[in-house]
Amino acid sequence: MFYSGLLTEGGRKETDMREAASLRQQRRMKQAVQFIHKDSADLLPLDGLKKLGSSKDTQPHNILQRRLMETNLSKLRSTRVPWASKTNKFNQAKSEGLKKCEDEDMILVSCQCAGKDVKALVDTGCQYNLISSACVDRLGLKDHVKSHKHEGEKLSLPRHLKVVGQIEHLMITVGSLRLDCQAAVVDDNEKSLSLGLQTLRSLKCIINLDKHRLIVGKTDKEEIPFVETVSVNDDNTSEA
């Protein structure tokens, strides 16, 4: 019985020691968790902190997760700006390229109008002679502009141009030929003048793309060379 009592007492001591060690370990773990909890919270921006409690939404790792998502979304939005900028630059380059192609396809010839040198566009896509309001101002033809006869009639014009008047007697010299023709005045800032299909037919014009010549005249034909298609506006501005 004596030995049995000693063994029992020894077992109790061992059990007590194990329980004490377990309690110490639990306290250390609790302290470690509290430290991590507090340390993680301290690393967060102050404006993102709430009173930390038992709610999962207010735990540090959840707040950090939300912050990470917000940061990623912010980065995603910021990366869209350069892409939009690239798209705009691409569209601008594309538009400039199309405009350049259109300019290169234009046929221009030198002529005189109101005693001044002008680059006239040979426009087979329009029935009428067109002169811009800017060109009217440059040539001093404002007094010759009259209201459009058929105001209710909408002329079929390229580039959605708006007719603001007409000139009944516009004197144009092409080569050695003098023309007395009508022209519709359009609201346009470019200093341009164009010869429409009606006038080209009346002159029996032939467009020779191989020789870059506009052949005019019914009997005594005359060849008018094309001029470089830099820009109608630039050409006529330089002559002002």
Swiss-Prot record:
GO biological process: proteolysis
Molecular function in Gene Ontology: aspartic-type endopeptidase activity
Top-rank taxon, per record: Eukaryota
Pfam families per the UniProt record, alphabetical: Asp_protease
Cited PANTHER family: ASPARTYL PROTEASE DDI-RELATED, NUCLEAR RECEPTOR-INTERACTING PROTEIN 3
Identification of the protein by name: Nuclear receptor-interacting protein 3
Origin species: Mus musculus
Gene for this chain: Nrip3
